[in-house]
Amino acid sequence: MGGPHAKAYMGWWGSIGSPAQKGITTYTVSPYAQKPLNNIFHNAVFNTFRRVKSQILYMALPAALYWAWWVNCRDYNAYLYTKAGREELERVNV
C-alpha cells in the first residue's frame, strides 16, 4: 500500500520503460457530443412540432369544453336579463 517501494519504481505515470499495461480501456467522445449545437434550429422546429402534435388533444379538448360552457352561460345570462327571461330569473333567484 502507499507509494513505490525500493527497487519497484518504474517512472512517472505513462513514462516509457514501464511494463505493458493490460486491461486498459480507452474511451472516445462521441461526435454528437463534440457538436452539441449541430442542426439546432432544424431540430427545434421539427421537435417542437412533434411535441405539440402529441399534446394538442390534452389542451384542445378542455379548452373547447370550457369555451362551450362559457358561451352557454353568457347567452343564458343575457337571456335572463331580457323581458322574455324575467319570469325564469325570478324563479331561479329564489
Swiss-Prot record:
It is found in: Mitochondrion inner membrane. It comes from the Eukaryota. One of its GO terms (biological process) is mitochondrial electron transport, ubiquinol to cytochrome c. Keywords: Electron transport, Membrane, Mitochondrion, Mitochondrion inner membrane, Respiratory chain, Transmembrane, Transmembrane helix, Transport. One of its GO terms (cellular component) is respiratory chain complex III. Residues 81-94 are mitochondrial intermembrane. Belongs to the UQCRQ/QCR8 family. This is Cytochrome b-c1 complex subunit 8. It comes from Kluyveromyces lactis (strain ATCC 8585 / CBS 2359 / DSM 70799 / NBRC 1267 / NRRL Y-1140 / WM37).
